[in-house]
């Protein structure tokens, strides 16, 4: 019996000891011609030395004698004992899928113009930012500062009005009508007309400027004016809301006026004409209605101060103010 045959039988015995082969396999091995099991000597595994695989030569199966695999019993090539394989997944849906139509494509790929929103809806807003009584040196003063708009998110018609009445007499009054166009979410370009009713005779100005929110929600306005006779002017305004609580708000304000030339009839001097700073503390009973108390400080400069002294007025004055702020 060749060494290869002996190795084959030993492997079968080892597998049998693990219960991995049926008895029929060994019956087939016993019936295999050319293999004399009686000649096989007991294998002393203690004599087996480490196998040097590097010395193993290629096996020539053509030299193997006496092994007739056709005589092996118990091995059925059909392998009926194996579990049947799972059926292949269907390649088509039970419910046929309808072909894509133009209507389907239109529903998915909409126009790039964006969703329809209320961009062009007309709205309005009216704010009485200052409607107050002032304790002035010359008596009681009624002061107002009103602005509002009507239009959409991009284009609006702005209305501004401010003035004061002292002891029932109108000292100053003006009205502005401006068309505003949004150039960013926070800033508008404005242009239009300004009409002065007092002081002096009425005067009409062309107006254009910029308004919006600066850093930290600081509201700012810069408006330039071109009046009759070549008169020019520039007004800078700003205010800021400081929330002490959700309803108690402190509001500092500032206004500066410049003019290109003197106008004695209206008490206006060239250059820096006048400034006004103030602070108002309001309590919002409702968001739309808030009474307030505050103080303002006015000062005239240059020729404007000289014209004020000629009228018997001081160049600077502090006033206590009481008023309400409301909007619609």
Swiss-Prot record:
Location of this chain's protein in the cell: Cell outer membrane
Region (Disordered): 44-71
InterPro entries (alphabetical): Cu-R_B_prcur (IPR007939)
Superkingdom of the source species: Bacteria
Single Gene Ontology MF annotation: copper ion binding
Segments for region (5 X 8 AA tandem repeats of D-H-S-[QK]-M-Q-G-M): 36-75
Pfam family, one: CopB
The Sequence repeat ranges on this chain: 36-43, 44-51, 52-59, 60-67, 68-75
GO process annotations (BP): intracellular copper ion homeostasis
Signal peptide: 1-27
Major subcellular location class: membrane
CC annotations in GO: cell outer membrane
Annotated keywords: Cell outer membrane, Copper, Membrane, Plasmid, Repeat, Signal
Xref: SUPFAM superfamilies: Porins
Induction: By copper.
Function: Exact function not known. Possibly mediates copper resistance by its sequestration in the outer membrane.
Stated name of the protein: Copper resistance protein B
Organism: Pseudomonas syringae pv. tomato
């Amino acid at each position: 019996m060749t060494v290869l045959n002996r190795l084959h039988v030993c492997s079968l015995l080892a597998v049998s000891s693990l219960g991995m082969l049926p008895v029929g396999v060994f019956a087939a091995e016993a019936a295999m011609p050319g293999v004399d099991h009686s000649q096989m000597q007991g294998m002393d595994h203690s004599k087996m030395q480490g196998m040097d695989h590097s010395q193993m030569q290629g096996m020539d199966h053509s030299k193997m004698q006496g092994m007739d695999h056709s005589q092996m019993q118990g091995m059925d090539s059909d392998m009926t004992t194996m579990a049947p394989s799972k059926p292949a997944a269907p390649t088509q849906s039970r419910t046929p899928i309808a072909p894509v139509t133009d209507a389907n494509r239109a529903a998915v790929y909409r126009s790039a113009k964006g969703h329809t929103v209320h961009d062009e809806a007309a709205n309005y807003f009216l704010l009485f930012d200052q409607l107050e009584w002032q304790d002035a040196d010359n008596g009681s003063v009624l002061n107002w500062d009103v602005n509002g708009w009507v239009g959409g998110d991009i284009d609006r018609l702005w209305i501004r009005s401010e003035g004061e009445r002292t002891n029932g007499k109108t000292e100053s009054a003006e009205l502005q009508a401006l068309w505003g166009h949004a150039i960013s979410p926070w800033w508008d370009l404005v242009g239009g007309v300004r009409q002065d009713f007092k002081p002096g005779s009425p005067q009409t100005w062309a107006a254009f400027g910029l308004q919006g929110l600066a850093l930290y929600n600081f509201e700012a306005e810069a408006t330039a004016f071109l009046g009759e006779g070549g008169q020019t002017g520039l007004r800078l305004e700003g205010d800021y809301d400081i929330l002490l609580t959700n309803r108690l708000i402190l509001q500092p304000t500032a206004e500066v006026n410049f003019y290109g030339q003197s106008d004695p009839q209206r008490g206006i001097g060239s250059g820096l004409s006048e400034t006004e700073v103030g602070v108002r503390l309001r309590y919002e009973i409702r968001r739309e209605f808030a009474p307030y108390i505050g103080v303002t400080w006015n000062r005239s400069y240059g020729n404007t101060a000289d014209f004020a002294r000629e009228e018997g007025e001081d160049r600077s004055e502090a006033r206590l103010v009481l008023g309400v702020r409301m909007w619609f």
